[in-house]
From Swiss-Prot:
GO MF term list: glycine hydroxymethyltransferase activity; pyridoxal phosphate binding
Catalytic activity: (6R)-5,10-methylene-5,6,7,8-tetrahydrofolate + glycine + H2O = (6S)-5,6,7,8-tetrahydrofolate + L-serine
Identification of the protein by name: Serine hydroxymethyltransferase 1
Pfam families: SHMT
Subcellular location: Cytoplasm
Keywords (A to Z) from UniProt: Amino-acid biosynthesis, Cytoplasm, One-carbon metabolism, Pyridoxal phosphate, Transferase
HAMAP family named among the record's database cross-references: SHMT
Positions of the record's site feature: Plays an important role in substrate specificity: 228
Species this protein is from: Vibrio cholerae serotype O1 (strain ATCC 39315 / El Tor Inaba N16961)
Assembly and binders: Homodimer.
Domain of life according to the entry: Bacteria
Annotated PANTHER family: SERINE HYDROXYMETHYLTRANSFERASE
A Gene Ontology cellular-component term: cytoplasm
Tagged with keyword Flavoprotein: no
Length: 416
């Protein structure tokens, strides 16, 4: 018999210590990695529920195991809420991650060797959009597109490449692009060559749910997203579509049995909670503040003489180009990390340095906004970061900045 008062602290002190250290790190560090966020205790409660015990291969009402009548209810809630949140007819809430959701789309719509048009990783795309080290680049003929000198997606280049190479699928979406994407133009290009338009909106799903960033759902044949990042739910994936029953059957089959076995029912329940939270008025207010905080930080970096890729941001993230400062992204990442400010090194367009070193950093505001940062707090933070970057080898400046970080983290805890 299992006792409900069993706990990790008593049984596994080594693991418990690591968990406590990570908990403290999250409270005492400012999180600026654009793909990270803090999920709610309600989401974590669902993930720690007894739904973790249930195997449920198949879909609601069509399972391969018995005893699924209650997990069916949980999955149906998640599906209905996802459809309501994003305005679509179809949702598959079973993908374990965004990458697995993307893999399912490839499997559903393409054959190995088919031609795909995807955003270059070096210009802001994602590994699963055709990087040669990823399955997408290994199994498909990928033609990359990028951004122009002004830092905007080059739609004319995209159209020319589409007309030349006749891709079967065009991929929209990004991991490091700060501007508004013209989904309508992308669909027009796809239609000209008879291609599917597949959009990976993982980074901006929360902004889209709140109506502060344009939705690709009315234009794309298929849309995928993660359920964490700006959406602030559990780590997982989601597929959406309005393209009709034939498409829905292909997508369902590609997820199960094509790429996965049993779904993670405790995570699906957590997705249902997160989707409900995303329909609340305060979530919409939060997402609007995310963008305002990003814009405030950009303005402060520019005032301090730092170059911002695309010269602005219209979402939750931006890239700081450090080439002119003769600082590597790796150095900036390490120095800011020593001041308890977490960012990630990131390649910038036409970066002369390797992806392991880079010439830029990516900055995102979902997490700081979640813990209550105002626009003034965001400006102050950008100034502190510039202080560190201007004095990258000065331990005194780094330590003084760390003390400021600890003070604001104490004032604005993640979990009060």
């Amino acid at each position: 018999m299992l006792k409900r008062d069993m706990n990790i602290a008593d049984y596994d002190p080594e693991l418990y210590a690591a968990i406590q250290e990570e908990t403290l790190r999250q409270e005492e560090h400012i999180e600026l990695i654009a793909s990270e966020n803090y999920t709610s205790p309600r989401v974590m409660q669902a993930q720690g529920s007894q739904l973790t015990n249930k195997y449920a291969e198949g879909y609601p009402g069509k399972r391969y195991y018995g005893g699924c009548e209650y997990v069916d209810k949980a999955e149906a809630l998640a599906i209905d809420r996802a459809c309501q949140l994003f305005g679509c007819e179809y949702a598959n809430v079973q993908p374990h991650s965004g990458s697995q959701a993307n893999s399912a789309v490839y499997m559903a719509l393409l054959n190995p060797g088919d031609t795909v048009l995807g955003m270059s990783l070096a210009h802001g795309g994602h590994l699963t959009h055709g990087s040669p080290v990823n399955f997408s680049g290994k199994h498909y003929n990928v033609i990359p597109y990028g951004i122009d000198e002004a830092g905007q997606i080059n739609y004319d280049e995209m159209e020319a490449l589409a007309l030349e190479h006749k891709p079967k699928m065009i991929i929209g979406g990004f991991s490091a692009y700060s501007q508004i994407v013209d989904w309508k133009r992308m669909r027009e290009i796809a239609d000209k060559v008879g291609a599917y338009l597949f959009v990976d909106m993982a980074h901006v799903a929360g902004l889209i749910a709140a109506g502060v960033y344009p939705s690709p759902v009315p234009f794309a044949h298929v849309v995928t997203t993660t359920t964490h990042k700006t959406l602030a739910g559990p780590r997982g994936g989601l597929i959406l579509s309005n393209a009709g029953e034939e498409m829905y059957k292909k997508l369902n089959s590609a997820v199960f049995p094509g790429g996965q076995g049993g779904p993670l029912m405790h995570v699906i329940a957590a997705k249902a909670v997160a989707f409900k939270e995303a329909m609340e008025p305060e979530f919409k207010e939060y997402q609007a503040r995310v963008v305002k905080n990003a814009k405030a930080m950009v303005a402060q970096f520019q005032e301090r003489g730092y170059k911002i890729v695309s010269n602005s941001t219209e979402n939750h993230l931006f890239l700081v180009d450090l080439i002119d400062k003769n600082i590597t992204g790796k150095e900036a990442d390490a120095a800011l990390g020593a001041a308890n400010i977490t960012v990630n090194k990131n390649s910038v367009p036409n970066d002369p340095r390797s992806p392991f070193v880079t010439s830029g950093i990516r900055v995102g505001t979902p997490a700081i906004t979640r813990r209550g940062f105002t626009e003034q707090d965001a400006k102050d933070l950008a100034n502190w970061m510039c202080d560190v970057l201007d004095n990258i080898n000065d331990q005194g400046v780094i330590e003084a900045t760390k003390q400021k970080v600890l003070a604001i983290c104490q004032r604005l805890p993640v979990y009060a």
